[in-house]
């Protein structure tokens, strides 16, 4: 059986996380965003964002490795608009990551948000992406009724906020 290791990300992990993110975005948003825009999802583009998040100190990044190979990661921290609530900024996984492994990483993220003193964790999900909505609903997240239209990748997308009660 494969060995799963969950640990905080370091600067040495940025290249691998950026490569995974580039592949993930192209897969996740296929059918929602034009291919021309998706081809701009490059590792260099994502590395800059990941580096800024890691260096800011405002965000935490946990990653999971399966037998030493990066399989998924999650970015989270304090919600700047609601400091008593945590916010999961993104979760990225490879195509071979099991639902159980995703659950273990999300559980660790939620535990750290609890330890930070948060009472609720929020997560924004593309409304048309039923696969991701189904995953997080199975992990205990529920839509809280908040919805927004956000310009992402040069295109307006409809997103819904999900919440998880930490206490």
What positions do the PLM features span?
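Acetyl-CoA-dependent GNAT
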Residues: 8-11, 22-97, 106-108, 112, ...
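Glycine-rich phosphate-binding loop
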Residues: 100
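Structural motif
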Residues: 20, 116, 138-139
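Conserved catalytic-core motifs of GNAT/GCN5-like acyltransferases
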Residues: 122-126, 142-158
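Terminal substrate-recognition subdomain of acyl/acetyltransferases
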Residues: 2, 155-167
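Hydrophobic pocket/interface hotspot
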Residues: 17
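Conserved active-site alpha-helix within GNAT-family acetyltransferase domains
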Residues: 103-104, 127-145
């Amino acid at each position: 059986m494969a060995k799963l290791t969950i640990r905080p990300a370091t600067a040495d992990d940025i290249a691998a996380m950026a490569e995974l993110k580039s592949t993930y975005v192209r897969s996740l948003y296929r059918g929602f965003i034009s291919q021309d825009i998706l081809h701009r999802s490059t590792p260099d583009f994502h590395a800059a964002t990941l580096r800024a998040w890691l260096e800011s100190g405002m965000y935490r990044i946990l990653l999971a490795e399966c037998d030493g190979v990066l399989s998924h990661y999650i970015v989270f921290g304090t919600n700047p608009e609601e400091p008593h609530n945590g916010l999961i900024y993104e979760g990225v996984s490879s195509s071979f990551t099991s639902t159980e492994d995703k659950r273990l990483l999300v559980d660790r993220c939620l535990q750290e948000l609890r330890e930070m003193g948060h009472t609720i964790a929020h997560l924004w999900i593309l409304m048309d992406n039923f696969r991701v909505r189904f995953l997080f609903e199975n992990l205990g997240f529920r839509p809280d009724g908040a919805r927004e239209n956000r310009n992402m990748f040069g295109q307006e997308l409809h997103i819904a906020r999900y919440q998880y009660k930490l206490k």
